[in-house]
């Protein structure tokens, strides 16, 4: 029988789920039994069950910053989710809750507070997301990735831990990655991903510039569910995937450059791998602007180049990729000087302290 029991939560996008997985090996070493609460049909269910972690589904309403008719009905879903979470927590009796944010986390955190179960949350981005803002009053500690984030957190709850990086991401195999893509030449490899849900804009721009890009690079393109273009299935040097999990460490090890959104979890993995990256953050029209702040921070440190969505026209993306290639050594040199490290150990220590305070 395990010494401790933890229930993790978080969902909506992979960025609210995969950091939880980064903690799992170390939690098991520390003798934690691990279970997970997510939404019934979110991306978290597939990711978590694939990793053989017991999963409980609850109802949850989306948290919106804009007017929508569903804003009138979703609070009732949240209340239902709190009731369902209370039932699960009463039965499971965890020692601590770890929340990675996303709208599914709010009912779980509130239920844990009602049951007086310690809650530790983690915020990846520079400014707290809406779910973590709502959850913060019910949390014992809120771990952050960026030092600048501490000023947004009240009552000395903030703890600077860094971003949890999955160990397997650092242990990919380049030869295996090239083999998966059937790349047999020595061209440099450009790895493109638009987040777990894909990016229509990035997909279109890459395909528009594909022939030019293929002169210099082989291309791995993670394009999102339902976004594989059948017109390019047999295009030499161009490999498309809807989404990858097990193959990701090998594909990232194989690549020389990355084009990506600027979610904090991902960019700290790119930094750990020392991969020169062109960051295309979600615009303020489609987000709260957190990715723009993340990308600006990395550009300022000299780790990445940045291209705003509004700047993408004509040949701008292609020219920016050529600049990325030209500045490869400079960017790698800057990343090698970085003091950033994985936050796994620091987060585990916060969880252990929370459990011991409870006991």
UniProtKB/Swiss-Prot annotation:
This is UDP-N-acetylglucosamine--N-acetylmuramyl-(pentapeptide) pyrophosphoryl-undecaprenol N-acetylglucosamine transferase. Its main location: membrane. It catalyses: di-trans,octa-cis-undecaprenyl diphospho-N-acetyl-alpha-D-muramoyl-L-alanyl-D-glutamyl-meso-2,6-diaminopimeloyl-D-alanyl-D-alanine + UDP-N-acetyl-alpha-D-glucosamine = di-trans,octa-cis-undecaprenyl diphospho-[N-acetyl-alpha-D-glucosaminyl-(1->4)]-N-acetyl-alpha-D-muramoyl-L-alanyl-D-glutamyl-meso-2,6-diaminopimeloyl-D-alanyl-D-alanine + UDP + H(+). GO terms for biological process: carbohydrate metabolic process; cell division; cell wall organization; lipid glycosylation; peptidoglycan biosynthetic process; regulation of cell shape. One of its GO terms (cellular component) is plasma membrane. NCBIfam families: murG (TIGR01133), PRK12446.1 (NF009102). Belongs to the glycosyltransferase 28 family. MurG subfamily. It is found in: Cell membrane.
